[in-house]
């Protein structure tokens, strides 16, 4: 009985959340709408990231897949920590969720580019492992 009640509550909660969800309207410059749009932008970037990741794992052997999985998990941890740090000043404010979403979107889009470049590497191209690096920009 308890299990059925809990399931019913979850279904009602999901339905209520879906009914309250708003779509992005870029002509509305209220903070609430900017937060919604930034969240949708991040969701789109995350979908592109998942596709780029899947494309790369499909081309890797077992060891490559394992190493990519470890790298991706570490990158996600870094991304989340970096965005938490870089948006800490706005914590508690109405703009905070937008800033977090924008940070997540920016870093996620950068990662999509990295994964896409790695998926297009030719075997033996040692410079392809780190796309976009310019040796002239090395930190001294």
Region spans (language model):
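N-terminal alpha-helical modules
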Residues: 19-140
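Bacterial N-terminal signal peptides that target proteins for export
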Residues: 1-9
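N-terminal signal peptide c-region/cleavage motif recognized by signal peptidases
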Residues: 14-18
């Amino acid at each position: 009985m308890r299990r059925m009640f809990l399931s019913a509550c979850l279904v009602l909660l999901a339905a209520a959340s879906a009914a309250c969800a708003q779509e992005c309207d870029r002509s509305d410059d209220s903070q609430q709408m900017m937060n919604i749009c930034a969240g949708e932008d991040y969701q789109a970037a995350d979908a592109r990231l998942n596709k780029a990741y899947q494309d790369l794992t499909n081309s890797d052997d077992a060891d490559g897949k394992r190493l990519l999985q470890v790298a991706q998990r570490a990158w996600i941890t870094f991304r989340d920590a970096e965005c938490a740090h870089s948006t800490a000043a706005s914590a508690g404010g109405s703009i905070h969720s937008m800033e977090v979403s924008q940070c997540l979107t920016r870093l996620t889009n950068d990662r999509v580019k990295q994964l896409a470049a790695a998926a297009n590497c030719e075997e033996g191209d040692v410079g392809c492992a780190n796309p976009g690096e310019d040796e002239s920009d090395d930190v001294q």
